Amino acid sequence: MKFTLNWLQKYVDTTGLTPTEIADKLTMLGLEVDSVAPIFEELAALKTGLVISCEKHPDADKLSLCQVQVGDDTHQIVCGAPNVREGLAVTVALPGAVLPGNFKIKKSKVRGIASAGMLCSERELGIGEDHDGIMELPEGMAHGQRFIDAMELSDTFIEVDLTPNRPDCASVIGTAREIAGKIGRPLQIPVKDRQIEAESRDFSVEVESSELCPRYTAKLIKNVTVGKSPWWLRKLLVSVGMRPINNIVDITNFVMLEYGQPLHAFDFKKVAGNKIVVRLPRENETEITTLDGTKREISAEMLLICDADKPIAVAGVMGGANSEIDAESTDILLESACFNPVSVRKTARNLKLPSEASYRFERGVDPGGVVNALDRAAELIAEIAGGALCSEGIDNYDGKKAVEVQRFSISRTSSLIGVEFSGEELTAMLTSIEMVVEKDPENEDILLVTAPTFRIDIEREADLVEEIARIYGYDNVPTATPLVALSYPEQDDDRLKRYPLALKLTRIGFNEAINYSFVTAQHADMLQLSEQDYRRKVVTLLNPLSEEQAVMRACLLPSLLENVKRNISFQKTAVKLFEIGKIFLAQGEDVQPIERQCITGVLSGNKFGESSSLYFKSANVDIFDAKGTVEFILSEMGLTDLANNEKIEFTVPPEGAREPFSTQDYALTIHLGPNVLGTIGKVEEEVLKSFGIKHEVYYFDLNFDALCALSPQTKAFSSLPVYPAVKRDIALVVPASISAGELLATVRSSRDKLMEYAEIFDVFEGGKIQKGYKSVAVSITYRSQTKTLTEKNVEKSHSKIVSLLTDRFGGSFRDA
């Protein structure tokens, strides 16, 4: 809804309020203000002038050489307008002024004659479409004034974004009513409480469906003169972005904006049979040419306004070209009606013809205000276009609805808003927005409220409470701290571990995946699970969205493998994903499934990521990357050393205990004593094929709930080492069946007092290494807490560890 501050001022006195304050009050009333801005500021540099002489240009028949007085100065201006003449008050753009469209005025020569400015037409000023001549200002207007001051164009534009439940505010009067109620000032309405006194005999109206057209009113105005609208009317329309057309059409548009009631004017001489019929199309009526000159197809459900022979308008949307007002029209049939909102909405959408009228009809117009708008427009037409005004007309109101009275509790309203109101205060606020309020003779706490017909959103007591809150002011409601007993949620220790761990995994190159808990039942077959595997017993959904989401997942790995396939299809050369989520293990009918939280990860492609240097392009992930990630997880969770000196171990599972989707050569079980905490491995090629993956994929799968339940060993802190460390590397060639982890565990179990740390840094097969054997390289750090080690001290401890490895594993050593 668009209006200006000066227009609003015609209906409610806003003296003392700035545009910003008015916008704030509208916002607090629940009307969202989109914009507040001054208008016609681009015309501020223009002046009023007086043509004191006008002569023909010596070198051009169609140009005039004018002397124009602007204040104390006289300017010579060459003008080509046919209506320029001596004594004419004009709008002058002097050099330096900028017209709409960024047209800069400069001193120039026109056919050899100097011209110091421009006399402007309405189109050049952006306030109309007339370009046949310059704009003629009122006779006797003082020259030298600012044009926007002289023509009262200086104004503020306000645009309000209305919600669908407030069609009453799709008018300037409706908005003024809200402001008046808020600031406690009277509302001035030009025409109200009108009724059609007598039925006209000059024409007839027939409405075939009162459901589609609850009310239809019309008046005939004779002997009008169609012409240009007066300046005040054109100015108001232009200020809100509407194009003036002629006095009749401009009046209907003005009243629509003023009252929120769309109107339409027919040329009565073009209405066959002097009859209006509101009906649906006949079988042979398939198209109509609307006012914009476009032929439009009409369908069977579109409501039409017809004369005795043919359709002459699409109800609530647009008039027909066969009955439009033109310069020759003298008798006007003025329509003011109420159409079904749903019907108008469908018609406007189907015709792709939104309009200001359909905008209001779609939201619902006031059936009680139809005659007020009709009379207001009729009076303006008689005043401006010289028509003969008569009181007769036709009012077909077959769709009138019974008035509903709402019971309104004073005490409940006070309780809900938090302010103690009296019945008199509530009555004053409601009557300020034109509601009728009476006391209930049987109950002092109850007011009987009748909402006006334009408030279609008032349906129950809660709506009235909202009206009181709006008018009183939400910002005036006192704030009070609610007395609520606070309860703190139980601390989720697992969650406190989950988030930091996920964050740290992303920092070492992983991406977190969050997949649906609903998966396909085919996953068990794709993983090659045995018939006895507990993960085949799934929780089935009663109403799945699709077959792809028919069961609850019993394992996180399948969804991650689908993620791998998708990433590879997008040319990702390095994929590292993990997910921390729940799996659901069925326990039989009528028994809740076990929910277990797991952390599962997959690794495929380049070891160092897509941005790795050329040197590392061929380095792909292997089982040690998966194992290293698990060790990182255990370390970050503080589970490297457990209470009671327990240790989490990695072992090669026996053949029957290996995961069916893991290869035989690359499989590890993670356990704490007899309890299995998870597995690591390389996914079988056949399993990968079932997921459409052609690249190697390594995985880890851990019971996160079980890990969170473990108690880490209390850390014992010692002072920082003072003496330097000595590193020695050894490489042992052993049978390929011996795991590197077993060899490392042997080194660490030596318990040599000088050995501080040991780690494997290389495992190598092939080359000069005998087939069936591999080289395992171990780095050992030696340090003393009391002295600097000598070569002799280190050699003694190192030899001891070498002997230990030789005795246990055999093989040969090579000093690294």
From Swiss-Prot:
Gene Ontology biological process terms from the UniProt entry: phenylalanyl-tRNA aminoacylation
Binding-site list for Mg(2+): D457, D463, E466, E467
GO MF annotation: an example: tRNA binding
Family annotation (InterPro entries): aa-tRNA-synth_II/BPL/LPL, B3/B4_tRNA-bd, DNA-bd_dom_put_sf, Fdx_antiC-bd, Fdx_antiC-bd_sf, NA-bd_OB-fold, Phe-tRNA-ligase_IIc_bsu, Phe-tRNA-ligase_IIc_bsu_bact
Entry's cofactor comment: Binds 2 magnesium ions per tetramer.
Ranges of residues in domain FDX-ACB: 721-814
Domain B5 residue range list: 401-479
Pfam families per the UniProt record, alphabetical: B3_4, B5, FDX-ACB, tRNA_bind, tRNA_synthFbeta
Listed EC numbers: 6.1.1.20
Domain of life the protein comes from: Bacteria
Annotated Gene Ontology cellular component terms: phenylalanine-tRNA ligase complex
Keywords: Aminoacyl-tRNA synthetase, ATP-binding, Cytoplasm, Ligase, Magnesium, Metal-binding, Nucleotide-binding, Protein biosynthesis, RNA-binding, tRNA-binding
Cofactor(s) required for function per UniProt: Mg(2+)
Enzyme class of the recorded protein, top EC level: ligase
Domain tRNA-binding: 40-148
Catalytic activity, reaction form: tRNA(Phe) + L-phenylalanine + ATP = L-phenylalanyl-tRNA(Phe) + AMP + diphosphate + H(+)
Localization (cell): Cytoplasm
HAMAP family documented for this protein: Phe_tRNA_synth_beta1
Subunit structure: Tetramer of two alpha and two beta subunits.
UniProt family annotation: Belongs to the phenylalanyl-tRNA synthetase beta subunit family. Type 1 subfamily.
Name under which the protein is recorded: Phenylalanine--tRNA ligase beta subunit
